[in-house]
């Protein structure tokens, strides 16, 4: 007599579909355009290419902004030659969206490919093992999107599961990690390629006396792309885990509406910033820390490593002062701000890369400057704050980290 097959319930299937361990960052890659702009030279360059040299007082203000920015250099895709061919981008409010779009829909995925290729090489497995792609950029809304274009450029499997995030802003480096954590932990064997690619061509424009907040953006923003590969239950015969993600949260700060916003118009992406942004972040950051670290019984903010989005020097300074952080706590964040400027969502991933490389170079025992626990903060429009709790891992030397 034939026996009936065993009935498998939904709960059994559900458990089989999920990973056992936490989401882990397995590789990091970064890329920038070739065109390097030094901050000391930028005021002269900016006012020349925008034909604004007659605005002597405004140029002096911009010079002071650049001097106080703590930025040494930035990378930008747009060059003087490109701006000569597209003069509408140099006017303050001239219709120019078509020229901007034509550039970024092509160049954003291309720059993302450079970073992703480096991450895949470090990771060690063939790209065919990538199961999910999360792509994030502030610019170039298009259909099919940059996620599709990157899938084609990299030669990923057509069945890769894609998620495209447009126009989130500076907090989104934390958002992509939060999403990748959920994907990796809820899909056994998943390997998530996360790419943030940012090009400032959508926000570049000439100066205007009545819009100093726009001028602040011209002094801070740079171009860059970063990629990470995230998965649970690493295969230690090939993969070299860097950081484990313990928890991730997002919140909107109270009384912060309109503090940072951006609007896509015929003139490109306009940017608005209120002066009290650093104070709003500093006022609310300890609450986010307490919520994130109370399960770990940690309340000494100098005992953890720090990866904070460097929106500008004032944000870092006020957070440092408010929490009584030692100067070295925000070293990695300040280093990336100095060498690359504010690259929006890509910044925190650049800082992750800087931290693990410097930890190895300095002979630290872990990827988190020798410490066990750390925090990654993203700040941006809303004001929105992303908080990711990280657990560092033993520092090991790989070919990628020596480059």
From Swiss-Prot:
List the catalysed reactions. Answer: (E)-4-coumaroyl-CoA + 3 malonyl-CoA + 3 H(+) = 2',4,4',6'-tetrahydroxychalcone + 3 CO2 + 4 CoA
| First-tier enzyme category under EC | transferase
The catalytic residues are 170
Name its GO BP terms in alphabetical order.
flavonoid biosynthetic process; polyketide biosynthetic process
Q: One Pfam family from the UniProt entry?
A: Chal_sti_synt_C
One MF term in the entry's GO annotations = naringenin-chalcone synthase activity
Pathway assignment reads: Secondary metabolite biosynthesis; flavonoid biosynthesis
Q: EC number(s) for this protein? A: 2.3.1.74
Q: State its role.
A: The primary product of this enzyme is 4,2',4',6'-tetrahydroxychalcone (also termed naringenin-chalcone or chalcone) which can under specific conditions spontaneously isomerize into naringenin.
Q: What is this protein called?
A: Chalcone synthase 3
Organism of provenance: Gerbera hybrida (Daisy)
Task: Report the gene name.
Answer: CHS3
